[in-house]
Amino acid sequence: MHKTSDHAQIVVNPFVIHGAALLIALLLQGFLPLPFVPATLARILGVAVFLAGIGFALPAARLMRSAHTTFNPNRATTTLLTTGRFHISRNPIYIGMLLNYAGLAIFFGTLWGLLLIPVVILLMNRWVILPEEEYLTRVFGEAYTTHKSATPRWV
């Protein structure tokens, strides 16, 4: 087991990145509205995309729980997961979060939210995922390097 002080040195919590982006999108939509799909369609699509995010992330979360490792990037990772959703992506929880973010943006009828997705991905890569990858390489060595070369970061 690893010391609890030994963890990825992320810059910003992933929830803060997604929440701030959604808030900025809603503010931009209020001040500089962009046309979007009708509200009823937006609600239906938004819920569908949001649920897809849960559907993608939930099996990964269950696998993490069964492996007794943490969801919290500020805690030590005890197990390298390479099966299930982690075979599809090294970051299935973050894919789920991104789909949740997109679903909320659609639900609230803000095209700005969708336009900000590349920014969210960029910030997640730089401030969260790269520090996590450095940490996982340090902790799991060749096993993580092999997983990293065989499995995409996103999809």
Feature names for model-found ranges:
Residues 86:
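Solvent-exposed interhelical
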Residues 1-83, 95-155:
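Membrane-anchoring alpha-helices and their flanking helix-loop junctions
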